[in-house]
């Protein structure tokens, strides 16, 4: 296995971009992996491509897998409305996409083993998305066990690490780190709506804007992009 190569699941948002840059700063070669999964907010794919180029990643691969074929989420089924009433506590919002992270990580593991990468960088964040079942520490721990059991390198004792450096970070800390790393925040995309401009009302926009205001960077909020 070639050491110091990371597969970064790159959505086009601030979390995945920050995780990728932390890996690069640590001396890792980074291969970006993005997914066209039938999401209504396709603009995130252009953001991912722009970020991959701007960050000078080793490679950037986009995989098409149509999760909109069966829907189950407002992100993949346009007949369902994106929630705009504000973040609801203790509930899983309809923006949760069934099995999405599980599928993405599985593909990432395949790519990592094929390319000789030793870890996968995930931008998942339990602090902001505590309602999502696949962004929690127990999910990550269980998937790591599966990854070790389901791969040749894992069985040989050289398992691919599922690495989520932002798992317990507040959103303000993520943006502060992104600024330190000189990530072009204005090139990232967070909005769930499939419009040309961020809506400023969906949960993702609200979380982003709140954090940016708290660190004094209102100039990067959704209404200014």
Swiss-Prot record:
Its EC number is 6.3.4.20. GO terms for molecular function: ATP binding; ligase activity, forming carbon-nitrogen bonds; zinc ion binding. The keyword Signal does not apply. Keywords: ATP-binding, Ligase, Metal-binding, Nucleotide-binding, Queuosine biosynthesis, Zinc. Pathway: Purine metabolism; 7-cyano-7-deazaguanine biosynthesis. It is an enzyme of class 6 (ligase). It comes from the Bacteria. GO terms for biological process: queuosine biosynthetic process. Pfam families: QueC. Its cofactor is Zn(2+). Binds 1 zinc ion per subunit. The keyword Membrane does not apply. Catalyzes the ATP-dependent conversion of 7-carboxy-7-deazaguanine (CDG) to 7-cyano-7-deazaguanine (preQ(0)). Belongs to the QueC family. HAMAP family: QueC. This is 7-cyano-7-deazaguanine synthase. It comes from Prochlorococcus marinus (strain NATL2A).
